[in-house]
Amino acid sequence: MRVKCSISEDVETLINQQIKKEAHSSAIYLGMASWCARNGYEGAAAYFFKQADEERDHQMKFFKYVLDMGGNAVTPEISNIKQEYNSFREVFEEALEQEISVTQSIKNIAARCQKENDFLTLDFLNWFFKEQREEEIKARRAVELFDVIGEEGTGRWQIDKAVGAISYNSEA
């Protein structure tokens, strides 16, 4: 039953797709954490466990928003999560690609909201844009470590230790 929902069905559908994308991202990060832990990269595993938690938090924010606006939030089914990677670097390259994909998906919701003059949802999305900027910067920095430090000798060990220290401060 839809009683005075404050978002359109199109926006609701897009947000439900985003809920699934966030849940999928969380599961991807758990798979990455598992691979890293199994391969001795404990720092990276901890980094990806944290990322998985953050993605689930994002999923829940979207889920609650749909409900708060009188819509129907859909619990997503998640499958086909990658568990194996060819290299330590590949894990981080795919994490960056995932963050860029999430950002693009949120942009698509915002574009639809702009078209519909749905300023409440646009305001809600602003938090996610700031969050995604941070997530992309951190993921990009992790990939850059492979070029800065290199993988030879103790390079991967140093990268594993450095990943946990990556932070972002938006204050100039």
Residue ranges and their predicted role:
Residues 1-172:
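Iron-associated oxidoreductase/ferritin-like identity signal
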